[in-house]
């Protein structure tokens, strides 16, 4: 995966024996479907042809489903989008999702990569969704983060 401004270059790696799950919301379908496509492509490039994919309605549902997926997967990728509106709802949802995913990852000792976009506008989300006109592919980046972290944890545990 090639990096852009501040984005690290991630060399090719083999994660074919990593059990990967992806949980993606369905709000803002075009954006979430693009994030999921980027995640699937990175998984395939890493040797994973059939990751478990679960779709949920909104971002707030992602942490509890991610928690369940950590029970029998080595890595989980969380994908979705929350776009700022006119009420504090945005702040509450973003905080709950971020804290929830972090807690799930730490409690389960399983990497849970946060690919939930939290943007001020739909345009910002589209620019990060991995579409042909996007500058970034956060679905791909989150998947690379989850898989490389799973491989790192495997190495550390083998040394213990």
From Swiss-Prot:
The record's top EC class is: transferase
* GO terms, molecular function: 6,7-dimethyl-8-ribityllumazine synthase activity
Q: Set out the biological process GO terms recorded for this chain's protein.
A: riboflavin biosynthetic process
Residues holding (2S)-2-hydroxy-3-oxobutyl phosphate: 86-87, 128
Q: Which reaction does it catalyse?
A: (2S)-2-hydroxy-3-oxobutyl phosphate + 5-amino-6-(D-ribitylamino)uracil = 6,7-dimethyl-8-(1-D-ribityl)lumazine + phosphate + 2 H2O + H(+)
Question: Matching InterPro entries, A to Z?
Answer: LS (IPR034964), LS/RS (IPR002180), LS/RS_sf (IPR036467)
**Pathway(s) the chain acts in:** Cofactor biosynthesis; riboflavin biosynthesis; riboflavin from 2-hydroxy-3-oxobutyl phosphate and 5-amino-6-(D-ribitylamino)uracil: step 1/2
- Extract the SUPFAM superfamilies matched here: Lumazine synthase
Gene3D superfamilies (alphabetical)? Lumazine/riboflavin synthase (3.40.50.960)
Cellular component GO terms, alphabetically? cytosol; riboflavin synthase complex
Which residues of the sequence carry a binding annotation for 5-amino-6-(D-ribitylamino)uracil? 27, 59-61, 81-83, 114
Q: What is its EC number?
A: 2.5.1.78
Is Transferase among this UniProt entry's keywords?
yes
Provide the assembly information: Homopentamer.
Give the function comment from the record: Catalyzes the formation of 6,7-dimethyl-8-ribityllumazine by condensation of 5-amino-6-(D-ribitylamino)uracil with 3,4-dihydroxy-2-butanone 4-phosphate. This is the penultimate step in the biosynthesis of riboflavin.
By what name is this protein known?
6,7-dimethyl-8-ribityllumazine synthase
């Amino acid at each position: 995966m090639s990096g852009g401004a501040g984005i690290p270059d991630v060399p090719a790696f083999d994660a074919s024996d990593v059990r990967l799950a992806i949980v993606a919301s369905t709000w803002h379908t075009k954006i979430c479907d693009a994030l999921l496509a980027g995640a699937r492509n990175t998984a395939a490039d890493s040797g994973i042809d059939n990751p478990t994919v679960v779709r949920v309605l909104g971002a707030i549902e992602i942490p509890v489903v991610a928690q369940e997926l950590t029970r029998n997967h080595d890595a989980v990728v969380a994908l979705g989008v929350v776009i700022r509106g006119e009420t504090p709802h945005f702040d509450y949802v973003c905080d709950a999702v971020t804290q929830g995913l972090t807690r799930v990852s730490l409690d389960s000792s399983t990497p849970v990569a946060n690919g939930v976009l939290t943007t001020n506008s739909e345009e910002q989300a589209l620019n990060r969704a991995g579409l042909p006109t996007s500058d970034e592919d956060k679905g791909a980046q989150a998947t690379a983060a989850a898989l490389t972290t799973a491989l790192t944890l495997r190495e550390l545990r083998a040394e213990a």
